[in-house]
Amino acid sequence: MSLVPDEPSEESLYQHKPELLRSARELFRRGEVIFTLAERDIRAQYKQAVLGIAWALLTPLISLVLLFILAKNVKSFSIGGNVPTILTMYVGLITFGLFGGAIGGGSNSLVANKALMAKSHFPRECFPLSQILGSAFTSLMATVPLAILFTVHGFAPKLTSLWAPLYVAIEIPFMIGLVLLVSSVIVQMRDLQQIIPIVMPLVMLITVLEPLNQEMHKHLVPNARFVLGHGWLRDVYCFVNPMAPIVDNVRSSVLLGFGPQWSTLILGLCGSLVYLVVGFVVFKKLEVNFADLT
């Protein structure tokens, strides 16, 4: 399939006035392009690797080992309770990994595809959005070691795991908004390419290692002080970092049998929608400068 249509769509997105719904319809219509770009990147990522697709399994396992070592050696994050430590870590890691992979890959997507952008007429949002699909593939592969861990520890996921798709749905607008924002800003500020790999691991550690719910905190981190005990601090944190309530709810539903914590989820959803709108507006405002890439 050719990625370059015969002629531009009449509903071209290269307009100065952002129109979110109109652009959403256009992107939905060009969904095949996004899937094709994602498939191309996945094939290119593993094509020349000796271990090939196995890296999709090894990468989260390596991250898990590092996270496990950190949790065992930093007293304030010593995890205990009835839930196996490694499961606690890994479920949080997979959930955050979907977001982290999308931002890590999407942030550089416009710069990396400047040659294709110069001769294509489909919406430029397709490039960063395709990275979300690529990250989803990696996260899906990472569930294979998770199934093995459940079997080894004789620990079955709870029935409340069925809530997980809802939590991921809340994560989607956050990923879309932030990947559009970061990828467009990087076109103007290339230094941000060096900052993202430094910031993302720090955000991951804070998000994965600090539960929001006090009851879950007692199960997962019994020896640590409940930092987010103040209501206003927790609310601001959930709004600014929607991944916190998402990771928190996924982990508590899968491992502890808790239902949705609606107070934190609603804050996370509101934050996600704000990121979506801001990311889209900034992307469209800066889009006129993308020609500088060519």
Can you describe what each PLM-predicted range is?
Residues 1-294:
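Hydrophobic transmembrane alpha-helices and immediately adjacent juxtamembrane helices
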